[in-house]
Amino acid sequence: MAAKEVKFGREARERLLRGVDILANAVKVTLGPKGRNVVIDKSFGAPRITKDGVSVAKEIELEDKFENMGAQMLREVASKTNDIAGDGTTTATVLGQAIVQEGVKAVAAGMNPMDLKRGIDAAVEEVVGNLFKKAKKIQTSAEIAQVGTISANGAAEIGKMIADAMEKVGNEGVITVEEAKTAETELEVVEGMQFDRGYLSPYFVTNADKMVADLDDPYILIHEKKLSNLQSLLPVLEAVVQSGKPLLIIAEDVEGEALATLVVNKLRGGLKIAAVKAPGFGDRRKAMLEDIAILTSGQVISEDVGIKLENVTLDMLGRAKKVNISKENTTIIDGAGKKAEINARVNQIKVQIEETTSDYDREKLQERLAKLAGGVAVIRVGGATEVEVKEKKDRVDDALNATRAAVEEGIVAGGGTALLRAANALAIKGSNPDQEAGINIVRRALQAPARQIATNAGEEAAIIVGKVLENNADTFGYNTATGQFGDLIALGIVDPVKVVRSALQNAASIASLLITTEAMVAEVPKKDTPMPPMPGGGMGGMGGMDF
């Protein structure tokens, strides 16, 4: 076991604080509409330029083990806030640094760290309650666009695009952000349920120009196993032919004789048909087939539930207004499923999302939820260079997450103003002087984001904060982008409550841990031993030779 170095008390906290300051000072320059860029060196390719706090925090690793512990603890604040709210990472870092700095000073002055922590926790709880009280619910598409614009560092076109996407796919719909191949940023919306399986044979195509198969008002057969011969399927095929409707077969696979027979029937014009493979694999495939069945009011034909192919009747098949099949994707539009059954399935998936511990499973469940609930929107981010596209994509991701958070818990005045007001309204008292000091630490720290936003814009922070606090209106604040004072909610300068709340709670949680630290243990760095020199002299038995 390697030897360890141990630091105690004041020295330990000072080393932690040094690490916290290094990370926070690099991250906080990105805060606000006039936040500065941070350039990050990459081991290959061009350096990355970003204004995204969590991206900067993730890149920082310090040589000194003890300082690095402080930096990593503060990085955890940014990451946790990003996981919960998807934005607010820089605000969380600024708050964390402010609480740690004040807390370490208080402990050095002889105060009880545990009482300080109790005071900090009580103050944070009070502030969060105040934020919820002041929150304004989001109703209109214009308000959604405002939130998106603020989080995208003032890019109005990004805010509008996110608002359009949410309007089209609903708040539950999936909105993904991808890098575009062109210089333009564009929005593409896929309505209905789409899965990544195309037609099994190009002979199923109905539109040769676009190479797609369009089926209007089709029946949909959902089968769990492979189809290799059509004998057992003949009764239902005949019933479909007599109905005069097209048929879509979704099965694990359709192969050999079965596929050949379907193609021949399609080419002869006797049956308008298409076949696709079932989406997903294993248990996920079963769940997705069940989703399709509920969406189209059909049944999954499976021997597990005792249904054999030869016994299938028309009323067991799903229905939809339209199905569009390309080489790679199948889209079912306007399925005939009952609203109540679809909602029950949506709620069931929501419960699974909350219970799962795997990020991969959560992502897949959210995709399923979106496909059932409304559709999928894709924002393709374009730019002149790869560096620009990556920087813009960071901002779009932030804006999207902030917008979702705003729809969930409402909005408050932005620009750090809500926290300034909450600090003024903080009226609780501690049960002893040390707890009172903890409450005052939070009261002072709540000014830090507003001060930092002003500093980044080249303003005098103390003057700006003073002017804001002279006016008692809750939503009165400073618009850094235009340099004017006014009603921030009316001006569209807003922050989602979830983002502000998560930033404060996570910052206080980690800061309290750092303040109450009394010892630190790290490995002693290994000294590199130099390589021994090569032994001198020639090789034996080589005497008499000149070199």
UniProtKB/Swiss-Prot annotation:
One of its GO terms (molecular function) is isomerase activity. CDD domains: GroEL. It is an enzyme of class 5 (isomerase). The keyword Transmembrane does not apply. Its main location: cytoplasm. Its EC number is 5.6.1.7. Keywords: ATP-binding, Chaperone, Cytoplasm, Isomerase, Nucleotide-binding, Stress response. InterPro entries: Chaperonin_Cpn60_CS, Cpn60/GroEL, Cpn60/GroEL/TCP-1, GroEL-like_apical_dom_sf, GROEL-like_equatorial_sf, TCP-1-like_intermed_sf. It is found in: Cytoplasm. Together with its co-chaperonin GroES, plays an essential role in assisting protein folding. The GroEL-GroES system forms a nano-cage that allows encapsulation of the non-native substrate proteins and provides a physical environment optimized to promote and accelerate protein folding. Forms a cylinder of 14 subunits composed of two heptameric rings stacked back-to-back. Interacts with the co-chaperonin GroES. This is Chaperonin GroEL. The lineage of its organism: Bacteria, Pseudomonadati, Pseudomonadota, Alphaproteobacteria, Hyphomicrobiales.
